[in-house]
Amino acid sequence: MAPPSVFAEVPQAQPVLVFKLIADFREDPDPRKVNLGVGAYRTDDCQPWVLPVVRKVEQRIANDSSLNHEYLPILGLAEFRTCASRLALGDDSPALQEKRVGGVQSLGGTGALRIGAEFLARWYNGTNNKDTPVYVSSPTWENHNGVFTTAGFKDIRSYRYWDTEKRGLDLQGFLSDLENAPEFSIFVLHACAHNPTGTDPTPEQWKQIASVMKRRFLFPFFDSAYQGFASGNLEKDAWAIRYFVSEGFELFCAQSFSKNFGLYNERVGNLTVVAKEPDSILRVLSQMEKIVRVTWSNPPAQGARIVARTLSDPELFHEWTGNVKTMADRILSMRSELRARLEALKTPGTWNHITDQIGMFSFTGLNPKQVEYLINEKHIYLLPSGRINMCGLTTKNLDYVATSIHEAVTKIQ
């Protein structure tokens, strides 16, 4: 008699919520269906958009006979790493000029977070110190918890961020949690377009946050997934990162080029490291190299080449910023239109938070029962938290979505 499968006792894992939602949407035959859960840009025809500048650069790469498919270095394409870190920190960054910045090419923003988390678990605040508290915002992108837990951190905590009553930033709660955190704790900060709330601190509020973090010796780990994509302005979206660097912080910044280049399936990311002196960067990168070697060993070239060529060529860079602004402006327009329709319908509650928020997502304030109603009765797919992707809205479905939200709010308490 053959023994049972060695995999017989493996439990079935729960599906990843957002991808389950997308699968349910695809299987829904209702012609009215609307996908507000997808985490990617869509045109007004609800189609993916390949940026024109990306098409142009792809063609140039394809026709460049000097290129080949040799392995990239373990830390990635040098030109890409330099350009990516410069984009985050600014051309005039003292840290760059003083050569105390390093970059690690990664598999998207998630890869940058993971490599950074693995390094911190081994080398931050004492060798192999996985007891260091890691703070993530409440709420946050669900992968933050998983990445740091999987890297071995044992103490993942939440810091207050979202005020449900006023549908905005809970600054006092945030500052209080910073004050009460153990010294040298790690704080995961959203650089701009906070996911899922779409609510960012103002520059003045960032200054207050930085002041407490500096006094308490707290380590900032920025997640920058939407630079340029949030406001349409690269400098504005990187303001917090650059301010922290100007204040003398050592920090990590996980960068993603999925959204602002539309390179979702190329997995283009970078981990920018800022230290106090050049020698530290050399040692940190030497350890990062060891971690990458046993994780993915060498990163892919195509996406990194596209980004590096675009960022290093003034003409292509100008075209790219125009493409990014096109996406950002459409999202801002959909925010204004949705708010206007809900207010015209006299939907109970206040809806100014929709236009106060920024970036791809809006935290609507809808409760789980109202979300369930929208999915089951109206075939409008969104996360149980009430988060919607503004890119899923179009001039063709805005009226239907607004009317459906109005019904959900008035019928379901």
From Swiss-Prot:
One cellular-component annotation, GO: cytosol
Cofactor(s) listed: pyridoxal 5'-phosphate
Keyword Cytoplasm: yes
One GO BP annotation of this record: cellular response to insulin stimulus
Keyword set, alphabetical order: Amino-acid biosynthesis, Aminotransferase, Cytoplasm, Pyridoxal phosphate, Transferase
GO MF annotations, alphabetized: L-aspartate:2-oxoglutarate aminotransferase activity; L-cysteine transaminase activity; phosphatidylserine decarboxylase activity; pyridoxal phosphate binding
Record EC number: 2.6.1.1, 2.6.1.3
Ligand binding (L-aspartate): 39, 141, 195, 387
Positions of modified residues (N6-(pyridoxal phosphate)lysine): 259
Residues of the signal peptide: none
Enzyme class, broadest EC rank: transferase
Role: Biosynthesis of L-glutamate from L-aspartate or L-cysteine. Important regulator of levels of glutamate, the major excitatory neurotransmitter of the vertebrate central nervous system. Acts as a scavenger of glutamate in brain neuroprotection. The aspartate aminotransferase activity is involved in hepatic glucose synthesis during development and in adipocyte glyceroneogenesis. Using L-cysteine as substrate, regulates levels of mercaptopyruvate, an important source of hydrogen sulfide. Mercaptopyruvate is converted into H(2)S via the action of 3-mercaptopyruvate sulfurtransferase (3MST).
Similarity-based family: Belongs to the class-I pyridoxal-phosphate-dependent aminotransferase family.
Record note on quaternary structure: Homodimer.
Additional remarks: In eukaryotes there are cytoplasmic, mitochondrial and chloroplastic isozymes.
Protein name: Aspartate aminotransferase, cytoplasmic
Organism of this sequence: Sus scrofa (Pig)
Gene name linked to the record: GOT1
